[in-house]
Structure formats: C-alpha cells, structure tokens
Amino acid sequence: MKRCIKRGGRYIVCGDENQAINQFAGASSTAFLDLYNGPKTTQFELPISYRCDKSIIKLAQRFVPGIMTREEVGEGLIRRETLIKDIKPNDMVLCRLNSPLYMCYSRLMDLNIPCYIKGKEGELDELKKLINTYKEDENLGLDWKENGLFPNLYKALIEERNSYIENGYDNIEAINSQSVQYLYDNIQSLIAIGRKCQTVSELKHRLENIFIEIENGVCLSTIHKAKGLEADTVHIICPSLMPMKNTVTPIEEQQEQNLIYVAYTRAKHTLNFVSEGDFNPVKSLNNDIVDTFDYIEDRVCKLFKISYKKPKNTIIQPKKKRGKKINPIIRSTTTNVKTAVDRKNKKSTKNKIMDFLNQ
C-alpha cells in the first residue's frame, strides 16, 4: 500500500483492530496496529457507533470498553431465549458455525418464512463435492440401519482424523484440525438440509436454492461473512459456540472475542439470543468434542464391521501443592497436557456471555 503513495505524500487508513477476525485466511491480526508505529503517524480515535442502539452498545462494551453511542439513538432491545418462530422477514440470523444455520434454514422453510444462506462462490460446490461420487438413488442412511451417504461420510471423517494421529498429532489436536472441523461442519450442514430427503438426488435438488438471495428474506450468515452488514433485528443462534473451545493461542482467543463483538454490533435496534433447545447436537459438539467423535467412531465400526486403534485413558497425578488438595486428571494418552491446561483456563470470554444469558 505504501508503494502506491508518491514520495512525501500522505494517506489515511481507517480500521478497527477489534474486528480482526480473518487470521485463519492469512490476514494478519496486527497489521492495522503496526501502522501506529510508522514515522510521523497521527492517530485519531473514532469511538462512536452510529449503527447500534444504547442497550446493544452497552453489551458490546463488555468486550470493547471504549465504544460509545451517539446521544440521540433509541434504547434498543435485547431478548434472551427467543424462538425460531420469532424470526421475521428482513431479519438477520448469525452463528459461529455453518451447520446450525442449515438447521435453522430448514426450520424456517417448514414455517414458510422466506430465507437464504449467505454463501461465497464455490461454497455450494464444496457441499456437492461430498455427494457427487454417490449414485442418485443412494440412500442417505440417516438412521444408521444400513450403508448410505452419511455413514460413508462419517467413515471418511474418522479416517481423516486418524491420518493426523498417525502423523504425530494427539487426539484433540487431530479433531480440532482445520480439515477435520471443516469436514464435520459440512456433514452436519448436509444432514440439516437432507433431514426430509430420502436419496442423494433429493438432497442435491434441495441444495440448489439455498444460496439464492430472496428479497425481504431472512439472511442467515456466519459471523465472518456478516462483517460490514447490518439489520434492524439480529438473531444469534447457538451463542454457546462463542468462543469456540478449540482456541489455543492468545491470538486465537482474541479473534474469538472479536467475533462476538462483530456479531453483537450487526444489530441496529434489536438483538435476540435464540434458545439452544433446538440445537442440542451442535451445543454438545463444543462441550464434548471427544465424546462426539467417539460416538461417531463407534457407529461407523459397528455398521462397517471394522475397528480402529482407540487411545487409552490414563490417570495423571499432578504434583501436590502444600495445603491444597488436587484431584487427579483423567485424559487420553494422546491428549497434549499443555493443550488441556490452556483449554481449561480459557473461561473469561465464555463467562461474560453466559453470565449475561443467565441473568
């Protein structure tokens, strides 16, 4: 960018480090901050939000204390434990992951509420790629009673995880790897769309229309894709997925906090937190990731009559500190100790959200 400026010229950069959320795609989380250190740099603060009402800004201040609202805005409304049926045309629905959005899409279609999923070019092709190798009349196998599309996709998922373990990763690191998580999320998305389908052909047909924008329709989007967008009313589904528990580094933790801030500040007047009662399978993914994969592996092994080498559980006795009782930790032998400790200690952002939701 600097090379585009003539010698002695000046340039203005406007940005918000609290909205740095794309490090996973190669974007530097510190690039904007690095500009502060340049020679003859003048910094101007722009703390006022001209989008959100007061109550929404007050909630966002839990993560970005410096944000302010203009005096003439309304009070705004924040509601907890709302329902999918409360979603109306022109509203926006946000989630940390894709698969709950597909579940919500199916429910809205059942309620005859016009909606679409905001997707990028090629995203539909990625979903189709998973099913294109199967025959049009192939059974989906959602009940696990016979071989079909989804048992085979889950088999591929377990084998993808195992490939990481064979290359030295521990169990949790393998499950949380980008390719395994991406495949799992896509499988869950297909299940949500195909729950009323019988064959691969029917599933393909239903996939064709989900990304076509509908005038006055409900926009369902991941938080990443919603950056820069706004709506009078925003519904957040599966808020327990924010922050994701598979964050390890401080930068990843900060990016998760930034995602929460971005999600809240898409709403102009009303911010709703949808009840998680309809999303229990997704909620359990974040809380019991290892148990979820153990269950999938067990079903795959029984259906295909195969077996994989499972990690054993080991009891680790921590060093006892004077005057303190320390309980033993039971973990997989393939679980990295540092990862387990880091994950256990990262509760601050999560607690901020859950304290609010439990008020």
Language model features by range: what are they?
Residues 14, 71-194:
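Conserved RecA-like ASCE P-loop NTPase motor core of nucleic-acid helicases/translocases
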Residues 1-81, 92-107, 118-126, 215-218, ...:
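Conserved helicase motor core of SF1/SF2 NTP-dependent helicases
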Residues 251, 259-262, 268-358:
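Helicase C-terminal subdomain and adjacent C-terminal extension
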Residues 135-274, 278:
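Conserved helicase C-terminal RecA-like lobe
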Residues 58-63, 87, 128-136, 288, ...:
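Short, surface-exposed amphipathic charged segments that create phosphate/polyanion-binding patches used
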Residues 5-6, 88, 268:
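Short conserved AdoMet
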Residues 10, 114, 270:
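Residue-level detector of anion-binding/catalytic polar loops
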